[in-house]
Amino acid sequence: MKQTFLSGATLAALVMLVALPLVFILLQAIFPHFSAGSLGDAFGGIPALLADPQLPAMLGGTLWIAAGVALVSVMIGLPLGILRGMFSLPLPRLWDLLFLIPFLTPPYISALSWMLALQSQGYLQQLTGWQLNDLLFSRSGIVLVMTFNIFPVVYFAVSRSLLASGTRLAVVARVHGASAWRAFWHVTLPMLSPALAAGRLLAFTLAIEEFGVPAALGSRAGVVMLTVGIEKKLADWPVDLPGAALLSLLLMAVALFAWWLQRRLVGEKEVTSVTGKPGENHGTLLGWMTLPAVLAMAAVGGLAVGVPAVSMMLTSVMGTLSGGVSVENVTLRHFAALFDQQGDALSALGTSLSLALGSALIVGALGLLAAWLVMVQKIKGRGMVDALSLMPAALPGVVVGVGLILLWNQPFWPRSPYNTLWMLLLSYCCLLLPWPVRYVGSALRQLGPNLEPAARVHGASPLQALRLIVLPLVFPALLAAMLMVFAVASRELVTSLLLSPAGTQTVAVFIWRQFEQGSVGQGMAMASLTLLTGLVLMLTALALMQRRTRG
């Protein structure tokens, strides 16, 4: 009975978090007056959308930028991943940590940091006399800025695939007369194809859903993307709910088409080593190529991490931007202002930390139950539970925000979380649910199928087996996922902009508003603290995962 209740409650929570927002987007897109309670004029919003002169620019800009980011991410991440996975590099874990930082840094903060560094009268021009304003505010500049945040997904996909599969098959090919290049081309690269395809698709998906970078750089570059268009339809008066819903469906269609196209190009084949479980991969010695390889890794790390970090820290300790880079202009007053009891910073920080903690606890519990019901209990309807729990991984944040607005801003609800902090909590939980599902699912696969049946033989109920056996064993993975959720939720931007109640700010909204108001130093001081907090949480999560792996 208790298990049936848990199954029903889990499915109901997933329907509320994931399915209903998507259903209401679809209803609003089909019936333009649905928000007013009318089902008339079906598909009446489509002609207005097609007549929008901005539509070709939004769709074309989204596809151009996303394709460029995916391509350049492969160009950077593939060779670096090969260096890390196939060869013996000095301090290999240091490179992994270095390339985690761009993925951890909120893209909008990176974009603002690049602006301060490269624009006219920016730090580069002050220090060297050069400026890259024209490159920064262009399509190519937007692609590069986004790529420096996104390429780690390709790097880690490639390097982890190589570290897992080893290089023994390539060595066998060399023994049988193949050249190094031929062995790589015909043996190693095909083994990499699934991981490379997954990384490329993820890079494309992350690019099409990005809001902060095109919002910060796009207007001066003449580039508009679908995410920015959706936000404008909700932020500008009069609010265009049908237009926002239709653009959200279009954005989802782009993501699904990319997934379908990749499956057509790559196929559903799986590449498997026939040698059994690979042993530890120590990597091939590079010899005289070690220094060039290290320099290449350091150059990418310097651009992806060093430039934004230095720009961020410089801005946070400069009294005024007009004062330039000088010792006389150094101050800590921006950091002191964050802790001013009469300011908005402490309130924003408290709001973000509370929401992040709530999100981590809720999705941790829901993700644990979903993974356990699907993989261990194998309940009826487990396919639906699995699909709903992982679907948010393919949903852009702006789409989730639109769906929640359309769902809860309806007159028939007796009580609604609309225009309260509960909306932010719902959005964070929806977006970040796949993290604990994947982490716990991976841990459950490693446990094997015999532990819980053994507990059942000795009289334990399914819930007792979950509480006394399964939970202690998967807890390190669950805690790591919850820390990741906390770190990401504490700096989420687009849903915070769409759903924050009037007069309430999160850390991300605070930073964004500081730039809009010209208080750049205080915004970057908050960004520095946010990045440091996220990095500490990320390192803690990695340590927990490593401990679980060793155990």
Question: Can you describe what each PLM-predicted range is?
Answer:
Residues D41-A51, F184, V330-D340:
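A short amphipathic helical element positioned immediately N-terminal to and/or at the very start
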Residues L169, E270-H282, L451, L544-G551:
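Short cytosolic juxtamembrane segments of multi-pass membrane proteins
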Residues L59, G177-A178:
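Polytopic alpha-helical membrane proteins, predominantly small-molecule transporters/carriers
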Residues W260-A296:
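Alpha-helical transmembrane segments of integral membrane proteins
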Residues K2-S35, A51-L163, M191-G212, A216, ...:
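Membrane-water interface segments at the C-terminal ends of transmembrane alpha-helices
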Residues G212-P238, G324-E328, L493-V520:
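Glycine-rich helix-loop "coupling/hinge" segments at transmembrane-helix boundaries
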